[in-house]
Regions:
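A membrane-topology feature that recognizes alpha-helical transmembrane segments
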Residues: 1-162
Length: 162
C-alpha cells in the first residue's frame, strides 16, 4: 500500500514537471506538443487507477472522466474554429480533466478562464504601450499576437491540485 501511495506521489511530481514544460514551450514557441498532452493523460489515468485500487472502488470513474475529456474537446471545437484557443490548448485541457473530480474540474475551468483573460489584458496593455512608444522612438520590438494559454492552464491546474 505504501508503494502505491509513493507511486501516486511521483505521478503528481511528474505532472508538475509536465506543467512547467507546458509553460516554457507555450511561452517560447507558442506550441503545446502532442507528446505533452499524451503524457498528462497517461499519468492521470495511472493516478486514477491507483487511487481506485487503494480505495477498492469500481473503475466507473475512469470511464466518466474519459467521457468528460471527450465532451470537453467537443465543446471547445467552436472556440477552436473561431480562433479562441489552439488545438494544443484544447488537448491539454482535455488530458488534464482526467486528473480532476467534477467539482475540481469546474474550479479548474473557471480559474483557467480568469487567468487566461488576465494574460490577454497584460498582452493588450503591452501592445498598447509598444504602440505609444513607437511614435516617439524607433523600436524593433514586435507586438504579441497570441496568448500563451498553456500558462493559464498550468497555473489553474496547480492552484486546484497542489
Amino acid at each position: 500500500m505504501l508503494t502505491i501511495t509513493l507511486f501516486i506521489t511521483w505521478l503528481y511530481y511528474l505532472l508538475a514537471v509536465l506543467l512547467a514544460s507546458a509553460v516554457y514551450l507555450d511561452w517560447r514557441y507558442r506550441q503545446l506538443p502532442n507528446w505533452l498532452s499524451l503524457l498528462v493523460l497517461l499519468s492521470g489515468v495511472a493516478t486514477l487507477l491507483l487511487q481506485q485500487a487503494l480505495a477498492s472502488a469500481s473503475y466507473d470513474e475512469l470511464g466518466l472522466r474519459m467521457l468528460t475529456a471527450l465532451l470537453l474537446i467537443l465543446a471547445a471545437l467552436p472556440v477552436y474554429y473561431l480562433g479562441g484557443l489552439a488545438a494544443g490548448d484544447i488537448k491539454l485541457i482535455a488530458a488534464l480533466s482526467v486528473w480532476f473530480e467534477f467539482e475540481q474540474l469546474k474550479t479548474f475551468l473557471l480559474l483557467t478562464t480568469l487567468i487566461g483573460g488576465f494574460l490577454a489584458l497584460i498582452i493588450i496593455c503591452y501592445n498598447f504601450c509598444l504602440t505609444l512608444l513607437s511614435f516617439r522612438y524607433q523600436s524593433n520590438k514586435t507586438k504579441i499576437t497570441t496568448v500563451p494559454y498553456g500558462i493559464a492552464i498550468s497555473l489553474g491546474t496547480a492552484l486546484v491540485l497542489f
